[in-house]
Amino acid sequence: MREETPEHPAPLRSGYTTGSCATATSLAAARLLLAGVVSEVAEILLPKGQHVPMPLVFCRLIGNGDEGAEAGTVKDAGDDPDVTHGAVVFARVRLVAEPGVIFRAGPGVGTVTRAGLTLPVGEPAINPVPRRMMTEHLAELAAEHAYGGGFEVTIGVEGGEALALKTMNPRLGILGGLSILGTTGIVRPFSCSAYIASIHQGIDVARANGYTHLAACTGNASEDAMRAHYGLPDIALIEMGDFVGAVLKHMKRAPVERLSVCGGFGKLSKLAAGHLDLHSRNSSIDLERLAQWAAEQGADDALQASIRAANTSQQAVALAHAQQVPLGDIVCRHALAVAREIVPPQVNVEMFAIDRRGLLIGAAQ
């Protein structure tokens, strides 16, 4: 292993999903019931074929065992900024007569209350891949021990109800806690796959509940602007952050009648330049391009030079507006052109730009 230095930092460390944690803990609890083995580590097989040892913080009978067994592990998200990192994910398993697996939401795991997700209303928020992982591991364990019955599996997350408030679950209609997630079993640092998945879920839930006008917003200020402008409810507001591309591309699979995209002027200027990831590490504000666009609308040489020399995009648009050059509208028109290249023609797209006070300073339809 090489030594980490400022010039050569160590690679970012991957972690494991809550689905992997649930699989390991349910397997350990079931093994205790069927084989009497108290496990310190549970080895699981991930969907892509990797065998992973998951350390446990407890594995014990509940009562004298008549009520089942439980096991827990500490969620390790690696170097990903995951809200569940360090939380204890646990499973309580009870043997039942009917073959198969019954899933329950324990403390800290949410319940689906709105249509549009991959799970029916009323089901615990344990996603399909984690369900399949648990079912396969438990079926293999049952076969090893010639057990013909089934399992009732309750998954919980300590502190999950509070952690869920930091996620999109309440807006998606997943109430009471977190979702048990994962498609590969592995968390890739800063992959943002979970965030993008939640954007898609937000769109799907809104459509399933009859909303035909959605507003995709970069943050709280743009959400407030869309609430004030259109009176849209929270379910129709899609918190996209920097991932405007995730919204626009999803329209191909899940179109709506009307899509309003709203963000800060700087973010919208990046979209106008063709960037679909608006984060500063992946795209930057092109002041030269803003000056050129202003020139096309009558900006003189002095204003163009001022825009090129501006410290921020907000300063650039303020300079332009002070001389009656509608740079906010110009940027929105270019952003709209980019969006229309992606979304299907039946989606009526519009753009809104706001300033730092949350006031609308540009629009295009």
UniProtKB/Swiss-Prot annotation:
It comes from the Bacteria. It is an enzyme of class 2 (transferase). GO terms for biological process: anaerobic cobalamin biosynthetic process; methylation. It holds the Pfam family CbiD. GO terms for molecular function: cobalt-precorrin-5B C1-methyltransferase activity. Transmembrane segments: none annotated. Pathway: Cofactor biosynthesis; adenosylcobalamin biosynthesis; cob(II)yrinate a,c-diamide from sirohydrochlorin (anaerobic route): step 6/10. Keywords: Cobalamin biosynthesis, Methyltransferase, S-adenosyl-L-methionine, Transferase. InterPro entries: CbiD (IPR002748), CbiD_sf (IPR036074). It catalyses: Co-precorrin-5B + S-adenosyl-L-methionine = Co-precorrin-6A + S-adenosyl-L-homocysteine. Its EC number is 2.1.1.195. Belongs to the CbiD family. This is Cobalt-precorrin-5B C(1)-methyltransferase. It comes from Paraburkholderia phytofirmans (strain DSM 17436 / LMG 22146 / PsJN).
